[in-house]
């Protein structure tokens, strides 16, 4: 286990998957990252490459050949190489194996750098195509899971709210085999007066989505086309608990 700490946060990362295992707010001792309880989900914050999500029949086709790639790729199941650590950052890297070339026909190098800056954790991913002779098709993503302050095991009560930065319009959803369906669906906005007023005046930054069973009736909220720039997680009293920002063109909230 590798650790990085400043005055506000303590980060722990495992070599397996270069996955965050813990992120503690040192002001109150609160654990921010989900603890990997297998009764719900045994992950914490895996990195996804060379695909995010799944493929139809687990197969991609290129130049007349078929390749079997597991859901979310394969780097989350491997041990990464520790590269270096500084006062405020830690870096890991992974390169393809010969066996992986049977699943994904490009030699690659993937690096992740975690940086602590005051009360912010920054994650940077760098992908290198090592083939030097053909363009590499890939997806890369992060899958962080956060502890909810007001979550209850039965899941029946609203555990908090989501507030979006950007211009959220509508959603995609996963269908058969976890692949995206073509139809677009409405965002499950809260029915409270604050949100109804915000939507009426197109003030999307004041509109909230409840975190509850009904919100995730179709498993996930999938925003494409750079609709979302950041998401705030609020507790039941609408106090900000965490903020996640990314330049990724697609967000999936699960």
Q: Over which residues does each language-model region extend?
A:
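Extended, loop-rich substrate-binding clefts of extracytoplasmic carbohydrate-active enzymes
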Residues: 65-118
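A short, structured loop/turn motif at beta-sheet edges
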Residues: 83-90, 115-120, 131, 156, ...
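Acidic, contiguous internal or C-terminal segments within carbohydrate-active enzymes
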Residues: 96-153
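Beta-strand-rich N-terminal accessory domains
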Residues: 1-62, 66-69, 226-247
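Short Pro/Gly-enriched beta-strand edge/turn motifs at strand-loop
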Residues: 39-45, 63-66, 92-98, 212-216
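Active-site/ligand-binding surface loops and adjacent short beta/alpha elements
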Residues: 137, 145-249
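Beta-strand secondary-structure signal
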Residues: 1-3, 10-12, 89-93, 111-113, ...
């Amino acid at each position: 286990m590798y650790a990085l700490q400043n005055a506000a946060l303590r980060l722990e990362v495992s070599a397996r998957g270069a996955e965050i295992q813990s992120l503690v707010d040192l002001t109150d001792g609160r654990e921010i990252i989900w603890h990997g309880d297998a009764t719900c989900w045994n992950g914490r914050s895996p990195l996804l490459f060379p695909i995010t999500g799944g493929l139809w029949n687990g197969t991609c086709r290129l130049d007349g050949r078929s390749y079997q790639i597991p859901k979310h790729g394969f780097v989350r199941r491997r041990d990464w190489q520790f590269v270096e650590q500084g006062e405020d950052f830690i870096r890991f890297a992974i390169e393809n194996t010969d066996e992986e070339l049977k699943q994904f026909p490009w030699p690659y190098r993937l690096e992740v750098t975690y940086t602590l800056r005051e009360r912010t954790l920054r994650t940077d991913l760098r992908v290198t195509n090592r083939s030097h002779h053909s363009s590499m098709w890939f997806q890369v993503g992060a899958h962080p899971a956060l502890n909810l302050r007001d979550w209850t095991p039965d899941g029946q009560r609203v555990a908090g709210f989501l507030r979006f930065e950007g211009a959220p319009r509508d959603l995609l959803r996963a269908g058969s085999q976890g692949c995206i369906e073509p139809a677009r669906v409405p965002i499950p906005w809260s029915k409270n007066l604050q949100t109804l007023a915000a939507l009426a005046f197109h003030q999307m930054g004041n509109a909230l989505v409840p975190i509850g069973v009904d919100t995730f009736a179709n498993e996930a909220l999938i925003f494409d086309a750079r609709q979302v720039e950041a998401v705030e997680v609020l507790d039941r009293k609408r106090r900000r608990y965490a903020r996640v920002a990314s330049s990724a063109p697609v967000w999936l909230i699960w």
